[in-house]
Amino acid sequence: MGMTITEKILCRHTDLDEVRPGMLINAKVDIALGNDVTAPLAIDEFRKAGGKKVFDRDKVVLIPDHFTPNKDINSAAQCKIMRDFAREQEITHYYEVGEVGVEHALLPEKGIVLPGDLVIGADSHTCTYGALGAFATGVGSTDLAAAMLTGEVWFKVPESIRFVLSGTLNPWVSGKDLILYIIGKIGVDGALYKAMEFTGDTIASLTMADRFTIANMAIEAGGKNGIFTPDEITEAYVKPRAKRPYTFYASDPDAAYAQVIEIDVNRIEPQVAFPHLPSNTKGISEVGQVPLDQVVIGSCTNGRIEDLRAAAAVLKGRKADPRVRLIVIPATQEIYRMAMKEGLFDIFLDANAAISTPTCGPCLGGHMGILAAGERALATTNRNFVGRMGHPRSEVYLSNPAVAAASAVLGRIAGPDELK
């Protein structure tokens, strides 16, 4: 019996000839990632374990993105721990404020993560890199510490669910809508500890930005990882960025799956996730009247240049409702520069938006857009749990960037088709 793409990548990072779901394995990592929230804990554990030098300074990546630029003394202390460690260890891939971006947008952009890689990160949305055809998953800080010390980490090989997407996307429908629809269909535990493998004829029409968004939110269905088979679109993205060899893997025709789920995308309209779970989804036509206090466009889910272009196309010549605070956060400095050169910032500023330097900021209730009790936000982020963006009595809704932009203009959740 053949292996899935996830099983193949895991196997190639061991000394085994094959792996099967349920096996416990030790695997070598290509990238071990930490951020300003999780890395300080890992550094402490690394030192407690007697660590003097990381296993490979080129493979340990440290990104201060969650509370940067630092919002307070505690966040400054967290970043200083990581910064000092990066300098001490001569870490190749440490990016300071002014150069840093939201980690899961920055690493692919820099060519740090490549197809066929095995990536662990002390951040649950590390699964984003599956869009490139890599095995990528989130771990705890102690596992990151072990990886920094040894270059290895243990896994239980996951079963795989194959999602077969067929058909053509409707207007204003993006990768965000596909993954929200899937999560709404299977639930937040519908893929618990399983690889979510995305296939079907629709995939060829998806941009890399769409694929990153879909893989990013695999964890919201409980997935161990999300993954795409690399193709010509992947190659076009990776080739100019890669500074080392990479490998394209694909599932064998006779690979075994725990489940196969077929999705007809022709039937999907823009989706909105209602509080307080990403699975609590409705089509835009079913939303009703939901007034808003804030709209956030950005994050590791939807802060790429394609996302900003989609929002700008809707906002051009329009202004945000005066009752709505509109915040736009490009995910990296490169995206920031591209948006500026393309005139997107003029559109955002004319719409009365606040434009931020790259940061995770409001997504995790960190800073740059915290909600008060009773306030309601629509965000292009990935989670809408109780208190996710501020007060426990606030509400967060999730959508794609075009819907977010239209909603900012109308002051309520709405699709772009409602604009005149």
From Swiss-Prot:
Keywords: 4Fe-4S, Amino-acid biosynthesis, Branched-chain amino acid biosynthesis, Iron, Iron-sulfur, Leucine biosynthesis, Lyase, Metal-binding. Belongs to the aconitase/IPM isomerase family. LeuC type 2 subfamily. Catalyzes the isomerization between 2-isopropylmalate and 3-isopropylmalate, via the formation of 2-isopropylmaleate. This is 3-isopropylmalate dehydratase large subunit. One of its GO terms (biological process) is L-leucine biosynthetic process. Its cofactor is [4Fe-4S] cluster. Its EC number is 4.2.1.33. SUPFAM superfamilies: Aconitase iron-sulfur domain (SSF53732). NCBIfam families: hacA_fam, IPMI_arch, LEU2, PRK00402.1. Pathway: Amino-acid biosynthesis; L-leucine biosynthesis; L-leucine from 3-methyl-2-oxobutanoate: step 2/4. GO terms for molecular function: 3-isopropylmalate dehydratase activity; 4 iron, 4 sulfur cluster binding; metal ion binding. Binds 1 [4Fe-4S] cluster per subunit. It is an enzyme of class 4 (lyase). [4Fe-4S] cluster binds at residues 300, 360, 363. The gene is leuC. It catalyses: (2R,3S)-3-isopropylmalate = (2S)-2-isopropylmalate. It comes from Syntrophus aciditrophicus (strain SB). Heterodimer of LeuC and LeuD.
